[in-house]
């Protein structure tokens, strides 16, 4: 099959959308299919093919609510006129989906859409946009959701739409088959007996790093511990991973200047942690290989993100055999049930679906899990076994292939 994937961003850009589409596209290429990705032109992309996947760039941006800009007609003409057997459009609220609304009826190949959560469903500015959504969805041959209950699938169900599948996210069997060879703890000066809490996400303060830090400030363990706060690598804007001579690793100044709102609380938490014996914080911008190694080298993954759909990091934590503790954001509770690799910490959810956890509540859950080594071992083992059995990208890609072929 000749398959076109449409997504706002793609490699070398980082993010969940990019990761999912790259994994699915590359797996399908390995199965003998042809895959092309239509995406935004970005600085630093010096290729038009990556691992067998053709990349077609367009200078377009925005969405129907904020406004579309760029060579929109070029993109529409490409999608309509090229001879693809199937098209997969990832995510609403962005140009690769919104630009095609007027021409969906002209696309004659099999059309598949992944709504991706509808993060702005409850925002007043998007009311008109989502009033039109049911009619737009009905023009697709098939829909793919990541959760059995969430904003996007609930909207589809409420309008009688039944042509869909629930296909979970996953983690790479190539990245997580075995722990990386280099010693992460040794490289960053972390002692073998230290209990390591890990959190990963970008942008930092939307992914709950402040709440995790404030919770860690309150955690009391009988053994030394380390909290690793990792953001995505970005050599143009952030420094490399810091060395480990001090207890507190500071954010690059450029980042701090752009996030003043939570910085006062964040700095206060860091100062308080610094005064406590046996506790350290490591703030990093690790490259991908080191992130994978951190998953294998840590003791508990802690996730306090404010808004998500189906967080990849929870599948990756399970794949590494690393127990996770997450707030009930997106379908985190469903992922915990599917993988049996983690637990959910209670947290409040506002009218727009944003989750906020009380640091003292999160701290107590972190303490409870860190103190129960047998339960941690059980969660880690169950998570890894279930990932191997059901949630590797190879198995997920096979489910996509069946949808693409209409079988």
Language-model regions, residue ranges each:
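A short, active-site helix/loop in glycosyltransferases that binds the activated sugar's phosphate group
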Residues: 126, 133-176, 181
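Conserved donor-binding/catalytic core segment of Leloir-type glycosyltransferases
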Residues: 142-144, 190-207, 213-220, 230-231
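A short, histidine- and acid-enriched strand-loop-helix "catalytic/donor-clamping" loop
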Residues: 65, 92-96, 110-127, 142
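Aromatic "clamp/platform" in nucleotide-sugar-dependent glycosyltransferases that forms part
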Residues: 306
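Short alpha-helical donor nucleotide-sugar binding micro-motif in glycosyltransferases
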Residues: 293-298
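Short hydrophobic beta-strand element within catalytic cores of glycosyltransferases
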Residues: 323-326, 333-337, 343
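Nucleotide-activated donor-binding/catalytic signature segment of Leloir-type glycosyltransferases, i.e.
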Residues: 239-289
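A short helix/loop element that forms part of the nucleotide-sugar donor recognition site in Leloir-type
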Residues: 74, 177-190
């Amino acid at each position: 099959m000749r398959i076109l994937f449409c997504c706002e961003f793609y490699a070398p850009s980082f993010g969940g959308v990019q990761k999912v589409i790259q994994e699915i596209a590359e797996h399908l290429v390995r199965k003998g299919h042809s895959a092309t990705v239509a995406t935004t032109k970005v600085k630093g992309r010096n290729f038009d093919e990556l691992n067998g996947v053709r990349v077609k760039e367009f200078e377009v941006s925005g969405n129907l609510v904020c406004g579309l800009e760029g060579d929109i007609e070029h993109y529409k003409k490409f999608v309509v006129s090229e001879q693809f057997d199937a098209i997969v459009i990832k995510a609403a609220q962005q140009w690769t989906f919104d630009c095609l609304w007027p021409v969906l009826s002209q696309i004659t190949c099999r059309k598949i859409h992944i709504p991706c959560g509808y993060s702005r469903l409850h925002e007043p500015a998007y009311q008109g946009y989502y009033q039109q959504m049911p009619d737009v969805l009905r023009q697709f041959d098939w829909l793919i959701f990541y959760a059995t209950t969430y904003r996007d699938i609930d909207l589809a169900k409420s309008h009688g739409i039944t042509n869909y599948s629930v296909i979970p996210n996953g983690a790479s069997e190539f990245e997580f088959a075995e722990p990386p060879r280099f010693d992460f703890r040794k490289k960053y000066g972390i002692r073998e007996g230290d209990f390591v809490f890990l959190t990963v996400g970008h942008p930092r303060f939307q992914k709950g790093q402040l709440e995790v830090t404030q919770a860690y400030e309150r955690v009391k363990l009988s053994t030394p511990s380390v909290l690793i706060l990792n953001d995505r690598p970005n050599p143009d804007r952030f420094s490399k991973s810091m060395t480990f001579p001090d207890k507190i690793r500071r954010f690059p100044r450029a980042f701090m200047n752009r996030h003043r709102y939570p910085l006062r609380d964040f700095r206060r938490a860091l100062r308080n942690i610094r005064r406590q014996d046996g506790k350290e914080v490591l703030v990093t911008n690790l490259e991908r290989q080191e992130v994978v190694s951190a998953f294998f080298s840590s003791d508990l993954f802690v996730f306090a993100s404010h808004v998500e759909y189906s967080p990849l990091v929870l599948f990756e934590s399970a794949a590494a055999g690393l127990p996770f503790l997450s707030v009930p954001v997106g379908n985190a509770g469903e992922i915990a049930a599917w993988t049996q690799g983690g637990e959910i910490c209670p947290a409040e959810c506002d009218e727009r679906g944003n989750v906020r956890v009380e640091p003292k509540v999160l701290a107590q859950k972190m303490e409870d899990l860190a103190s129960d080594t047998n339960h941690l071992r059980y969660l880690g083992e169950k998570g890894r076994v279930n990932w191997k059995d059901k949630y590797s990208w190879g198995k997920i890609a096979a489910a996509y292939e069946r949808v693409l072929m209409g079988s």
